[in-house]
Amino acid sequence: MNKYAIGLDFGTNSCRSLIVNLSNGDEISSHVFNYPSGQAGVVINSSDPNQARQNPADYLLGIEITIKEAIKKARVLVPDFSPHDIVGIGVDTTGSSPLPVDEKGTPLCFIKKFENNPSAMVWLWKDHTSYNEAQRITEAASKTRPDYLSRIGGTYSSEWYWSKIWHCSKENPEVFNAAYSFVEICDWIPAVLVGETNPDLIKRSICAAGHKAMFSNKWGGFPDTVFLESLSPGLGKLRGHLANKAYSAEERAGYLSAGWAEKLGLSTNVSVAVGAFDAHMGAVGAGIKKGTLVKIVGTSTCDIMISPNNKTLSDIPGVCGIVDGSVMNGYYGIEAGQSAVGDIFLWFVNHLVPDIYGKTREEKFSNLEKAAAKLKPGESGLLALDWNNGNRTILVDVRLTGLILGQTLYTQPHEIYRALVEATAFGALTIIDRIEEYGVDINEVVNCGGLAIKNSMLMQIYADVTNRPMKISRSEQTPALGAAIFGAVSAGKEISGYENLEKAQKSMTGISKTYLPINENHLIYRKLYSLYHLVHDSFGTVKQSGNLYNVMKELLDIRDNVRKDNVC
């Protein structure tokens, strides 16, 4: 008899349920639900482009619809399938995406007084309203608690837990004062499923706490009350409602509550794993192991690595955290990333590409890629910075913006499109160089996510720029697959057949395709990358005082040489 697990994947605009066969990793059915609230699921503010909130009611509706529909499909596709053979559920979400709740764990936006109040909703990962608070946290911790910053790259981000909560206290003191606690949605959703939403009893994820909330066992868990209160009066009160322990997603949050079991048609014996972020579970779904860099390439990109925790690992400036157990037990999880990748391409197509490339967005993307793929590296004479949504790694600065150099009166849209793709590849190489600079060897790169699977030009450019093979994960839904794997492991060996993640990964993950670097392309990209590096440091760092006089001229020289070779 086959056994199954469900992976629940909560993304920026939608959620999905994936049902996986535990014996071989076959993804037998899935269903996607687009969040109905706001604009594509995000509650925005036309007067403040930094705001990005989410309605948690969308998650609850999404759980019910996607699981029921996935089960319905599974019954059709697999004749002997029964929902009673589902033994585990894993949950991944975006993050840091904290939610203000009352003492029962009820979201404040569910209370009539705060209904439709964005401050009482989920503060989505890409909400950048708290950039000032993030800077002040960095300054304060640097002076009085430097250890708090040492394992998160040296800089606190506006995308993270404490900066958002602090900003909430200024933006809407009434909401802040009504909040008993702020709970990451990767913690709240499993708590809802098991029927234990008391903030004092929720099992908080080490993934979220360690990477985004300055949690470490070295100083007793979350930041101390004195430090928090020194930032802003009132912040310290929240510390009393945060436990001193955080949990790996390999552990069980509890069993599916009777209410949810009845609603979904499942057993109350279904194990629900502790939650984690989508990238970290996606890395497991992509088969991460020591020496493997997993890139989850989508609207943004998150890079994940692991390193054995029985060996000393140096702090790495500019990364989003080095956290013991955030990906797998026995390993430090290393997180880095780029704030926008697919979102840059989407912005360009939505706003700047003329209709000669197509009438619909899909036609424009298709024709742009066909035209851009015919170009040689350097042929356009363009160089871009991939900072349209700020820089996450290695500069950790949301106040940086995009840039395109080298345009002339003859520059074509597909040339700009390729330059934007190349910019994201240069950003990826910058992260690789930083990680290896601090002693972590990268033996292979595995890519997953929609862009990695669908855009062969992008993956070939990444291979050429980095001079490394780019492997593509077998699964097109790696975060959901990773969540299902965690759900299975949380059920225990006697139930699921797996006692740890490594054994589950071997049976349930794999590689579908590999892009090999082309040496002649790499040689040109080395020249372009040196210019990118100069521009990157000149605009992104205080210390760099390099002269940019030759950048445009060198771009033209590279362009002319490539075009001359094409004619020959």
Feature-to-residue mapping (PLM):
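Conserved active-site "lid/cap" helical segment
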Residues: 45-85, 164, 168-179
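Buried hydrophobic packing segments
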Residues: 66, 161-168, 193, 202-204, ...
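Conserved active-site beta-strand element of glycosyltransferases/polysaccharide synthases
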Residues: 295, 304
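Phosphate/pyrophosphate-binding loops at sites that engage ATP/ADP/AMP, CoA/4′-phosphopantetheine
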Residues: 66-86, 172-175, 227-239, 264, ...
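Conserved phosphate-binding catalytic cores of ATP/NTP-utilizing and phosphoryl-transfer enzymes
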Residues: 1, 76-79, 257-266, 276-292
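Gly/Ser/Thr-rich active-site cleft segment
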Residues: 10-12, 101, 138-139, 143-274, ...
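Glycine/Thr-rich phosphate-binding loops that ligate phosphate moieties of nucleotide
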Residues: 1-40, 45, 57, 84-135, ...
